[in-house]
Design a protein with these regions (language model features):
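Sequence/structural signature of beta-propeller domains
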Residues: 19-328
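Sec-dependent signal peptide recognition
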Residues: 2-7
């Protein structure tokens, strides 16, 4: 009976998600980034006293974001990527990924960044379905993720298509729980737990798996549907937050079940004529949440927005009046 009820909850959760009230977020500021020549701003986290970013075109560096008057400066910190472990992905996906990385740059395709309280930084590679840990002191190393993670994800219909793999990562402050987002077709949320020094699935690694098309926000006045997608994850106040690229929303989830609890919209601000990009599925790609607000970064691939700006952008939104953990 409990399994039947759990399955019913998974079936109903998209409908419940759609019925939740969505409050607009208030834009506090926007900051173009200089110093990220490849563009493709794809991950964001506050580590220590600074915001850090990654680009999915740069395999060997993080960027420390320094505030400025007219633009923020992205200062590169390089590292050496260790040899890759076996990913467990099928040959066809691996071959296509290698070819694309050679043609466009960014063989790792880094698509997310998170930090724990000890200063460890975690970068997720979409191309190889792997997580790289950069300790504050010591050499980078790939996490030994459990084989069941990939096996369960693919059995649930995720991680089956090229360029639709892991697209976001979040780690709790203790460094004991790590969440990954499968981007699209199907999209989903997965979690692994660190027990002593071993990462493992505690029961199922899959928290949430869903598919299906959705319309973009009404501001775009479009009748064409696109695949639902996750763009990034963040962890704050013992809650998991997802960046919903197509919907132009941030959604709060239960970290143990993946259930959607509440969503907030940034569509009014980002789809104003001057800030709008041509791609209808959205360009928001990086997310950080703290008590004061939300930071969102754009992966626009140097394409211009409505006012002609081509640099990556960092947007700062105020937190909801009742806080991120408030009830609808």
């Amino acid at each position: 009976m409990r399994r039947w009820l759990a399955g019913l909850g998974l079936l109903l959760s998209p409908a419940l998600h759609a019925a939740l009230p969505v409050e607009p977020l208030r834009l506090l500021g926007e900051h173009p980034l200089d110093g990220m020549p490849s563009g493709n701003f794809s991950g964001l986290a506050r580590c220590g006293d600074a915001l850090w970013a990654v680009s999915d075109r740069d395999d060997d560096r993080l960027y420390r974001l320094q505030p400025g008057e007219t633009a923020w400066q992205a200062e590169a910190q390089t590292f050496v990527v260790p040899p890759l472990p076996g990913s467990g992905l099928p040959w066809g996906l691996r071959a296509r990924t290698k070819l694309m990385g050679t043609l466009r740059g960014g063989e790792m395709d880094l698509e997310g960044l998170s930090c724990d309280a000890r200063g460890n930084r975690y970068l997720v590679s979409e191309a190889h379905a792997a997580v790289l840990q950069l300790p504050e002191i010591g050499q980078p190393q790939w996490l030994a993720l459990p084989p069941a993670l990939l096996r369960q994800a693919r059995a649930s219909g995720m991680l089956l298509k090229f360029n639709a793999m892991f697209e976001g990562i979040a780690v709790d402050p203790a460094g004991e729980r790590l969440w990954l987002a499968a981007e699209r077709e199907r999209r989903g949320l997965l979690v692994v737990h660190r027990v002593q020094s071993v990462w493992q699935c505690s029961g199922s690694c899959v928290l949430r798996s869903e598919d299906g098309p959705a319309l973009p926000p009404a501001q775009l006045e479009s009748s064409r549907s696109w695949a639902k997608s996750f763009a990034d994850l963040a962890f704050h106040g013992d809650k998991l937050f997802s960046l919903e690229r197509l919907a132009h929303q941030i959604c709060r989830h239960s970290p143990s079940t993946g259930e959607v609890e509440r969503c907030w919209s940034f569509a009014d601000a980002l789809l104003a004529d001057a800030r709008r990009y041509a791609q209808p599925w959205g360009s928001a790609e990086a997310l950080w949440i703290d008590a004061e607000g939300a930071w969102i970064g754009t992966d626009n691939g140097t394409l211009p927005r409505g006012d002609g700006e081509t640099r990556p952008m960092l947007w700062h939104f105020a937190a909801p009046a009742e806080g991120w953990n408030g009830a609808p």
